[in-house]
Structures are given as C-alpha cells and as structure tokens.
Amino acid sequence: MKQHSGNAISVSVIGGADGPTSIFVAGPGEKRALKAGIRDSIYRYKRKRAEKRIVAAPHSLAETVQYAKDKYGLTEAAATDSDYIEQMRRLKENLVLRQKPELLGSLGELPEPDLTDETAVQAFLDLLEARSRKIAQLPDDVVPMDFHLYKIKMGDGLLQMGIDYIWQDLSLSYSGNRAAMRKFKKTAEDLYRFYGVSAADIQNHSARYTALVSALCS
C-alpha cells in the first residue's frame, strides 16, 4: 500500500493469486471505514475456517471444571468474593431479560438512542440503571441459579470462569499484561474446545456453538 502525508489520498491494492483483485482510493475520512472493512473480511474468513474445524464432542460443565483444575490449577471463588457478587448480578440481569422480560414492564426492551444526541444517550443510560435496580430487587427464585465462579491466576493476570449449572451457562473472561493476555487467550480457547458442542448445537447454531466459534476466531 502506498501512502502520502497531508491531505493526499491513499491507494490500497488487495492482491489475489492472479494479480490485484480490488483497488480502493480513500481520502482521510474514508481510511477508518476501509480498515474496518478489511478487519471484517479477515474476521469472516477466520470464522468460516473455525466453523469447518468444529466437530461434535461435548463435555459436561463438571467435566470441564475438573479438566481446568487438573491442567491449569483452577480454584473456586467464595460467594463473598467481590467478583462473584458482580458476575452473579450480571447473570441475573441477563437471565431476567431473556427468560422473564415481562416482569420489567416498559424497561424490558429499551430502544437504542440516537448516539449523536447527548441528551438521548444520557436518558438511555438512566433507564439502564433503573432497569438494573429493578432486577436487583426481584426475588432470587424468579430465575433460580446455581452459580459458581472459578479463577486461574498467573502473576498479575486473572482468568475467570463463571458457570451456572441450572442454565448450563459458561462464560470466560481474562485480564492482565500482554504476556498474560496471550496465555489466557490460548487457555480460554482450550477450555471452550474441551467443553465443546453437540451435533444439535452445530445444527442450531446455539449460544454454546457461537461462543466456541468466537473463541476460535478471536
């Protein structure tokens, strides 16, 4: 790609096996859109490749936890842990929105605001806070949960695995420096692979299937 400074245009050539296949001429205001388009194309390619590699080989949540304990030293967080409390709160919100939105009345489904309107955005954020408060006040048996939080630590890095055994929900998140993030990215991919998917998950493109695909092409 050739680039010129100032207000000059940039010319991008995307090559193919038989020579250039696409040529884009972009001014300064179009460069970001061009880069986003290229990123989207790369992601779609990675996703398609990941989907081809997936086969039905599921394991249970309990088996996945034991695998992570044996291989990575996974430990369970106490119910008083601040991370446990926060993740359980988020899970309750998600479950109420998915399973019992009628309990929230007009707060159940909020239209997205005009992002160019600061007042509308602030009003939307206020509604989100009101919805969170309303969900927090609902009794826990509205959406029964059996939530557990597990952790893998590496220096200052941390990987968290949240599991609800009633809803068969597994989520992974991690943080840390660059080295820890690279390590945990591979760990998360390995855990999602081990948890796996069933033939029905593949056929129906279930949430479990989508999570695995996302992990493999991230």
Model-derived segments and spans:
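Intrinsically disordered, low-complexity segments enriched in polar/charged residues with Gly/Pro
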Residues: 1-2, 138
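Amphipathic alpha-helical packing elements
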Residues: 2, 6-36, 40
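Conserved mixed alpha/beta catalytic, RNA-binding, or beta-rich assembly cores of soluble enzyme
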Residues: 36-218
